């Protein structure tokens, strides 16, 4: 599970699709769900966790943990497993961390990068030894200012980044194809108008789902099928993370597939409730 080709992306696939496996028994084998879930779910959790850690992907590991904790917090029947999940997570992570030298170096590097970002944010914004991702994020602002309201056009960040004002020609750092964050990319390429349209749509969908699922009496309260899609959608649109390109990779296909299924499940339950 180390890498696919030259890219450290295997962990991202595990993070995005592993959550569904936890719901296979309740959905398709409800008769055996209670009997076997306590055995299979921990095994699956350990397999996926080990796979993500060994893949070398740091962000997918954080997102995988974030997804699990969201489900444990919002699903009442799962809250009793919170402490055991934390314990299992800690044992697996630190065991691999101490045994595998590559994993140790990988996460020490990640820790160092996070510290550098915090130090730059709090003390010196011009710190010369910026982590690579922070340099990529910082190219966004001047590029966005060139076309604040309507953007520079889809897939044009790679062009305008080199034409932005205040660019330092003597610096070796070269602009990337995108700023490695969905929201920054959408801002630079579609402007404030495109950004607001997309954000309003996401917030509206998220509010509708959560309100119907967790805060009022609704058919969705008992809908197990919708649970993984809700939390995968939340994690996918979570703003504080590094991402691939929104417009040029399979990320958007995955996001809108999740979105379409969510809307379909909501509309189905609303239709059933109205008929009743």
Predicted regions and their residues:
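Alpha-helical transmembrane segments of multi-pass inner-membrane proteins
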Residues: 5-77, 84-88, 98, 204-211, ...
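A conserved mid-to-late transmembrane alpha helix and its immediate loop/hinge
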Residues: 6, 53, 138-141, 147-150, ...
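A membrane-periplasm/extracellular boundary helix in multi-pass inner-membrane enzymes
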Residues: 75-123, 138-146, 154
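Membrane-interface loop/short-helix elements at transmembrane-helix boundaries
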Residues: 112-162, 175-185
């Amino acid at each position: 599970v180390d890498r696919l080709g030259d890219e450290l992306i295997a962990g991202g696939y595990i993070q995005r699709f592993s959550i569904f496996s936890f719901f296979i028994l309740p959905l398709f084998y409800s008769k055996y769900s209670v009997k076997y879930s306590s055995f299979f779910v921990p095994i699956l959790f350990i397999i996926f966790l080990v796979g993500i850690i060994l893949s070398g992907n740091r962000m997918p590991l954080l997102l995988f943990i974030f997804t699990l904790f969201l489900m444990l917090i919002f699903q009442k029947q799962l809250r009793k497993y919170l402490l055991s999940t934390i314990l299992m997570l800690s044992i697996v992570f630190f065991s691999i961390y101490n045994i595998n030298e590559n994993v140790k170096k990988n996460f020490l590097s990640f820790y160092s990068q996070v510290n550098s970002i915090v130090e730059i944010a709090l003390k010196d914004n011009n710190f010369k030894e910026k982590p690579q991702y922070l340099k990529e994020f910082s190219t966004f602002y001047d590029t966005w200012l060139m076309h604040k309201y309507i953007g520079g056009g889809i897939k044009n960040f790679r062009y305008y980044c080199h034409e932005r004002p205040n660019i330092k020609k003597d610096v070796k750092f070269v602009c990337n194809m995108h700023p490695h964050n969905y929201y920054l990319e959408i801002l630079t390429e579609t402007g404030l108008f495109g950004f607001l349209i997309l954000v309003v749509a996401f917030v509206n969908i998220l509010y509708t789902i959560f309100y119907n699922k967790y805060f009022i009496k609704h058919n969705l309260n008992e809908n197990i099928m919708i649970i993984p899609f809700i939390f995968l959608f939340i994690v996918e649109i979570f703003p504080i993370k590094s991402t691939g390109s929104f417009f040029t990779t399979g990320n958007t296909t995955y996001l809108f597939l999740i979105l379409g299924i969510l809307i379909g499940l909501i509309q189905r339950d609303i239709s059933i409730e109205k008929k009743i």
